[in-house]
Amino acid sequence: MHFRRTMSRVPTLASLEIRYKKSFGHKFRDFIALCGHYFAPVKKYIFPSFIAVHYFYTISLTLITSILLYPIKNTRYIDTLFLAAGAVTQGGLNTVDINNLSLYQQIVLYIVCCISTPIAVHSCLAFVRLYWFERYFDGIRDSSRRNFKMRRTKTILERELTARTMTKNRTGTQRTSYPRKQAKTDDFQEKLFSGEMVNRDEQDSVHSDQNSHDISRDSSNNNTNHNGSSGSLDDFVKEDETDDNGEYQENNSYSTVGSSSNTVADESLNQKPKPSSLRFDEPHSKQRPARVPSEKFAKRRGSRDISPADMYRSIMMLQGKHEATAEDEGPPLVIGSPADGTRYKSNVNKLKKATGINGNKIKIRDKGNESNTDQNSVSSEANSTASVSDESSLHTNFGNKVPSLRTNTHRSNSGPIAITDNAETDKKHGPSIQFDITKPPRKISKRVSTFDDLNPKSSVLYRKKASKKYLMKHFPKARRIRQQIKRRLSTGSIEKNSSNNVSDRKPITDMDDDDDDDDNDGDNNEEYFADNESGDEDERVQQSEPHSDSELKSHQQQQEKHQLQQNLHRMYKTKSFDDNRSRAVPMERSRTIDMAEAKDLNELARTPDFQKMVYQNWKAHHRKKPNFRKRGWNNKIFEHGPYASDSDRNYPDNSNTGNSILHYAESILHHDGSHKNGSEEASSDSNENIYSTNGGSDHNGLNNYPTYNDDEEGYYGLHFDTDYDLDPRHDLSKGSGKTYLSWQPTIGRNSNFLGLTRAQKDELGGVEYRAIKLLCTILVVYYVGWHIVAFVMLVPWIILKKHYSEVVRDDGVSPTWWGFWTAMSAFNDLGLTLTPNSMMSFNKAVYPLIVMIWFIIIGNTGFPILLRCIIWIMFKISPDLSQMRESLGFLLDHPRRCFTLLFPKAATWWLLLTLAGLNITDWILFIILDFGSTVVKSLSKGYRVLVGLFQSVSTRTAGFSVVDLSQLHPSIQVSYMLMMYVSVLPLAISIRRTNVYEEQSLGLYGDMGGEPEDTDTEDDGNDEDDDEENESHEGQSSQRSSSNNNNNNNRKKKKKKKTENPNEISTKSFIGAHLRKQLSFDLWFLFLGLFIICICEGDKIKDVQEPNFNIFAILFEIVSAYGTVGLSLGYPDTNQSFSRQFTTLSKLVIIAMLIRGKNRGLPYSLDRAIILPSDRLEHIDHLEGMKLKRQARTNTEDPMTEHFKRSFTDVKHRWGALKRKTTHSRNPKRSSTTL
């Protein structure tokens, strides 16, 4: 009741209300949303598209600027309006001298020009789309951050697994020694795992004498070595490595079970075996020099290639380590790893106790239903008085991927491997070995917390096995094996082993109890046995046992009740313990993770603690570790991995974490199915062919790639190491999806994602949102930064150059203000200067001309090129797997989804080549036609070249004049006029042909192929053939020859039309459609304006006294205004543009040309980069996806690149055909001359 009364007081606290105080940004967004709600009808009918909004913005800003300029009243309003329109549109045409304006008016023009440039307008659009993303996608900021961490975690795991695969294959190809001996072993191993009854002595009958001698010598070595340190397993390992000429010195943890166990030789093997004793022949034992006799160990094999001799020898050695102690003292046997640095001797005779089994049995048991390991036994009956007499039970985790060794005396069907010692067999071939192999299931780490968790050096690590049904599918005759297992389980023919010691401690857990529903499916009845040793062992298991069967049952029930669901914040902490805390064996602390509850990699990668652990582990090895030299594949590429030496392992124990993580990650990647379109389709049949046995082509088994079912996969490079010969930032998912998406997208042309689900759209929207957010920052820094750099480069120069300072001062302008204004005018391509004669006064100033050339280019047509270059450089130098790198990668791969002036790689290269070609063409024409003209005769040749370059660059965008254009060659004037018209076309075509909805914007909703044309061609061809057939019946030979020639020609044309690629027709149609649409947009307006001005200025045109007032000068002015360039032929004795001589109506026409030309480079109304996130956008995406699915065409190559590739290929083939034809035509002549 006290607890209930306490709870009743909780609602009193809930009545306290704290009002949320909105931030300024939140209030501003709410205000915009409120305005949008009230102006929704206006937006729908007056501003239906971005182009309409842009027109409104340009006209409104022009009127506002004119209103701001006119109060000074130093000019007429039409001239003020004309000047305002030129500043807003960057047209650069002026009817008044800028230096005659007041400083206030100049500042207004400065600010207005800066906020109305294409870069500023499109950047504002990017900010608007960023705002709309936050409004449309609820919580997109947090969800995008979560998705990024999930993708980063998966990318780390996949990179390490891929690196491991490549390293395994590479390492395996380099170790191919002893191929002849290996072939025999492979044949035996093939028989071993095919389930056949084989005799090991038959396999190696040729070497039986030598092997018998080796066995005897090994037994005598055991007798000698168990009393001294020379008999330790370290000596065996070192001797084995030395004999191999250092081939595996870096793999010292790969010898055998004994090499990883911190034990000494067997006491019980100190007696020489009798001839009638059970023998295991060791194949391919290498001849060693006659020095100190020692135990021989086989080379490191895969977990499926362990020979019975190695297993039996390891068992006997482990058993012989025991010493006589009390029955209730000491811990179980602890098997450490070579990396522990010290070897511990444990008192093993404490484990000796009568188990109720015959004294000549040796039983190996990995107890614990909580870990679901199999329970088997190994027995051998000695035929002499010197048989093994002690009985013990060894508790260790020998691995999980090698078949067990079982007795066949009473239960021949109870284990996968049975050893028989029959009388007949002893007489003929010795003991025979029967193998009945089943695939041991994979185990997943589990952890049990006990009171010993208080001790940081004690731990218990349990393991959980995967489904037996799945694992059995990896072997032939899997159905038969599963049936045998079911029969064994149904008959209960499994020997329950008693143990020596009672586990006095009960596990303490606060986990759920529903963890073992799928564990006790009989899997614990298939005990297996493997040598599980490595310096980077991620699991060290130590278990205790009850005294009797009843205690064993109760202990197992307790363990089953408390199956662990490890909290992820304790993932990387495990401890080991033994039964006697005061005598605890100090073991190296490992960091593992409980992944049993993760159903797939996506679920695991979304766990925050797991993400943090993986990233910290990766960053510790990839960012903090110094890498002063690059290592190749043969130069210790895995310095801290399984192939590392002991000296290289002295760094933080992070590889164990990587081993555990990647072991589970790889199993999930293969086991749970493929990741397609964001969904994981678990398919058991799809994984049947993943597990493949490699025939043992490598002597050491390194080519046998340990798949995800192998517990030892951490030994083959499953660690976090940057020292593989790969680019650490290499995009492993190239061609199979990018790292910024967790699913494999289907992408059409121009970054059109097809067939997305709601979750995928949200994830893609989050990635696009963060990319736009980063892009907005880049745009602001770009725009403001280059403005600062421009005036920083010009202001000091004009101040230091006294001559040019005086020129500026004579025009009534401060040199400092000239530097600021000229820098702005050059970067924004305004074309207006504070000096009346534009840049003619600086035609010999090399420095400002070169600086202005750079800023003219990067401020307009070169902006997309430089922007992509900056993003690419940032991508290269950004931290790997960072959020910035992911966003930059998305911008590089799908630029037109985010920004209108950012193009893909191919389109950017084409734009660069186009701009360079146009500028170089103008430059060459100027040098050819005007290099010796009177207008530049006063300049030296070097200055003439520089003036030509500056004028060719200014002609297309800026409108600066460094020479009198009216004095140039007429052909140069025509070329300049043409360049002013096409100035924006490369940029406009690039914008439109990279549009995500390119086909819809052009009105092309079907295949652009030529099926109707092909049909018509075939019909025409048939008609022609019929006509030719009719003509062939005529009797005249001339008609026959002409008809044959026509037939051949028509057939060639027909074949050419048929073989023409429909995609090529589509490419040509797209490019042609863009050009036709652009011309239809431009030409009628240009000629309409020319017509109106000719009407208004007819009298001046006809006046003979004004020869410079002609139609060409008017057309030049119109094209300059329409191209927003600002070049003008001028009028004699004036500094202003030619437009100053126009009437008011003609000036209004020029203003209309300026506003119209400002919008000619905009994208179509149907463009992904200008449509705000809304239901309309989703509807358009749906229509586009349906159309492309119907067309079954998802070509992502750039159309122009594809077209030119085909054209080049066609030209190449035609050239080759022409050469062959010429060669064939020459050969008959040569043969005839020789005759």
Curated annotation (Swiss-Prot):
Glycosylation sites: 100, 169, 222, 227, 251, 369, 383, 497, 501, 532, 580, 677, 919, 1030, 1135
Biased segments, Polar residues type: 164-179, 248-274, 370-415, 490-502, 680-706
Annotated Basic and acidic residues bias: 198-217, 540-563
GO biological process terms held by the UniProt record: intracellular calcium ion homeostasis; intracellular potassium ion homeostasis; potassium ion import across plasma membrane
Biased composition (Low complexity): 219-232, 1036-1049
Main location: membrane
Chain positions found as Phosphoserine: S15, S414, S534
Gene Ontology molecular function terms on file: high-affinity potassium ion transmembrane transporter activity; potassium ion transmembrane transporter activity
Protein name: High-affinity potassium transport protein
Species per Swiss-Prot/TrEMBL record: Saccharomyces cerevisiae (strain ATCC 204508 / S288c)
